[in-house]
């Protein structure tokens, strides 16, 4: 989804300058999110960062539906970039906690890389097939929700 965030802004009628400024600010928010995750650390066993992160990620995707004007687009992009860089370390910490022999963590980069390669191809096909980005955004929201469910289920099973 992030690969096409500029396209979503352009389709909503935003100028290239507006989109560029939002993406620059979003990058700063991403740095802040990563810093926040580093400051918080993963030593606490609570689930708040994962639940909050996924919730805000899904909200940010939802804000992009329906060709948002500048303010909604900016909020969505800033929130998405902040939240993704904040929640990812906590997701990876959950996965590491489930890994008893190192194989899962060894393959996680392959899975992330595969998603980064396949995601834009699938998203591009959706954008080409439909008149708006809304189906892509709905699919992204569903994928985030499924990921949350899988992380929660695996974490609960790992504690049994």
Task: List the predicted regions and their residue ranges.
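Extracytoplasmic gate region of multi-pass secondary transporters
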Residues: 1-24, 31
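A late C-terminal transmembrane helix in Major Facilitator Superfamily
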Residues: 99-132, 140
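Hydrophobic/small/kink-forming positions within alpha-helical transmembrane segments
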Residues: 28-32, 62, 82, 113, ...
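C-terminal transmembrane helical hairpin of 12-TM major facilitator-type secondary transporters
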Residues: 44-91
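Helix-to-loop junctions at the C-terminal end of transmembrane segments
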Residues: 32-46, 127-128
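Transmembrane alpha-helical segments of major facilitator superfamily
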Residues: 20-30, 80, 108-112
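Intracellular helix-loop hinge segments at the cytoplasmic ends of transmembrane helices
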Residues: 7, 81, 88-98, 102
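Symmetry-related core transmembrane helices of the 12-TM Major Facilitator Superfamily/SLC fold
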Residues: 135-153
């Amino acid at each position: 989804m992030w690969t096409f965030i500029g396209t979503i802004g352009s389709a909503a009628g935003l100028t290239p300058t507006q989109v560029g400024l939002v993406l620059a600010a979003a990058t700063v928010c991403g740095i802040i999110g990563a810093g926040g995750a580093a400051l918080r650390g993963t030593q606490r066993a609570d689930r708040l960062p994962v639940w909050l992160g996924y919730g805000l990620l899904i909200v940010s995707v939802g804000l992009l539906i329906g060709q948002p004007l500048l303010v909604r687009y900016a909020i969505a992009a800033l929130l998405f970039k902040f939240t993704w860089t904040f929640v990812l370390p906590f997701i990876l910490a959950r996965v590491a906690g489930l890994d008893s022999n190192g194989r899962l963590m060894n393959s996680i980069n392959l899975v992330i890389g595969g998603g980064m390669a396949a995601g834009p191809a699938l998203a591009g096909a959706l954008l080409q097939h439909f008149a708006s980005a809304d189906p892509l955004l709905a699919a992204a929201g569903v994928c985030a929700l499924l990921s949350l469910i899988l992380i929660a289920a695996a974490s609960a099973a790992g504690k049994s």
